[in-house]
């Protein structure tokens, strides 16, 4: 995707879709462990990292707090890695588990909706490029 045809929008949408896949895995793990004693629900912060990567893409260099947060090289947008951590917003149950199944299912639904929206946007962008490529010389 280093070609100029694939602009910042496509790179950003692609990275957002990858983030949604990561988030799906995190939420699925939380749901799967809803009955596991002492399991701590995980949370993922990707939006902040994605925003920083998009902002820094044009600067040509990146400042990071930890070397593993970004992979340097062919552009920052598509190579951002999300931070996954124990969710501090959840209360413990009697067995020490912190999964709130209702919140996790709502997050799963929200994640699915946003993933589908990103998919539609990238498909429209690619359809426009296909149209221009096939009808540009007419």
Positions of PLM-derived features:
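Amphipathic alpha-helical polymerization modules
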Residues: 1-138
